[in-house]
């Protein structure tokens, strides 16, 4: 395909236009008074959301340079979402501010590489300041406040805090759709481990990239499964029972994998293959944990069991299994409660007797998975559109709460970033590096200004006032009051705030140091087919 090339200022400005198109659509959602964005879908009802990364993913621009600019900012939102689960809009607003200020200085003759070094040093200083001022999350109320802000609903925050209280920091919280109105919290015995589906063809929900199995059988194998003849007798029994199958093995490959995939695509048999978690003896132990949880047996030559002769009675069962590309969650395994208690007691004894910190940590993880269980938040709404939007907000808030517990919280509403700016005064930078640090200083006020703007206030006046208040005090955009934000429950996880800044700065530095952009040349639309009557087109009938 032919390429088109832009250089210098033309290249950078093309990228900036794309960034601005995307950022302008995303930033209207920031803060408690932010608005929603409606996203058209090719199939089904439109989606209404205020989630930055969901909006960013939907934006496709026509101009090739603008398209690349937008894609770079999508990366900021996506990376922040992956790391922290929230802060995607803040990251986009920061990226826009950094690029705008940076390009202004590049156009005025500043050295882009000097600016890049200055930005990186400034971000490092601000990140250290944020981590230094973070307060540990100690109470259920603090978790509720943080999650409530992320979801834009205090009742959701309280429910998430309740769920975390029940399953602990290590426990698993999932969100499901409900047929009834309102929110419900259900605690179910369950387990999650960090291995996803072996092939993307197993996915049953393409939009969420998940494979969901209801009431499945669970086959646990201590070795590789590669030949279909080993698997066939057992598969036939499972198909006769009319249930889906989850296979957890050292690996599933070759004709065994292709047989499962082909049957899934044809719709004759629903299954998912997953690699067993861990390595060596740890893998054996975790497979045994899953066997006890699901009421099955690990099929292994060590215990005299083989796939060819295995019956359906050796399979485990569960109410539901959800598999993503990275992890598997087993909900309500059919294992015997007494056997699970015995296994938990055995692991606790191993923890007490272990001399190795690493082994102890791994045993604690296994204990949390066996004993912690899974909290299920069931969300209901009047329409499918509202239900999707609500479910998405709750999922974001759960990740937000976990981030808060992990690294602590800082004042929300963009205040922590603005009040971290004095950390830049301690940097002894000169020339373009000093200019780079100043670009970061200007950008730090951007999220607060956008929140104020969305709340109908004058951004410059609000930023000036907040910069002169004592640390932690700022604008509560919901009430319009200036107060101690942590005391008022307006807090952000420091992990979210620092990730937003770090990812925004990373992309901004790439923007500034770009000197040429190579893009695909837009293809011209094919000419309409000629008149089959041949040369009669001018006649009027």
Swiss-Prot record:
Domain of life: Bacteria
Location of this chain's protein in the cell: Cytoplasm
Function in brief: Together with its co-chaperonin GroES, plays an essential role in assisting protein folding. The GroEL-GroES system forms a nano-cage that allows encapsulation of the non-native substrate proteins and provides a physical environment optimized to promote and accelerate protein folding.
Protein name: Chaperonin GroEL 2
Cellular component annotations (GO), alphabetically ordered: cytoplasm
Organism: Nocardia farcinica (strain IFM 10152)
HAMAP family referenced in this protein's UniProt entry, alphabetically: CH60
Subunit note: Forms a cylinder of 14 subunits composed of two heptameric rings stacked back-to-back. Interacts with the co-chaperonin GroES.
Catalysed reactions, as listed in the record: ATP + H2O + a folded polypeptide = ADP + phosphate + an unfolded polypeptide
CDD domains listed in its UniProt record: GroEL (cd03344)
Family: Belongs to the chaperonin (HSP60) family.
EC numbers, comma separated: 5.6.1.7
Sorted UniProt keywords: ATP-binding, Chaperone, Cytoplasm, Isomerase, Nucleotide-binding
Recorded GO MF terms: ATP binding; ATP-dependent protein folding chaperone; isomerase activity; unfolded protein binding
Keyword Endoplasmic reticulum: no
Residues annotated as binding ATP: 29-32, 86-90, 413, 492
One GO BP: protein refolding
Keyword Protein biosynthesis: no
Annotated PROSITE patterns: CHAPERONINS_CPN60
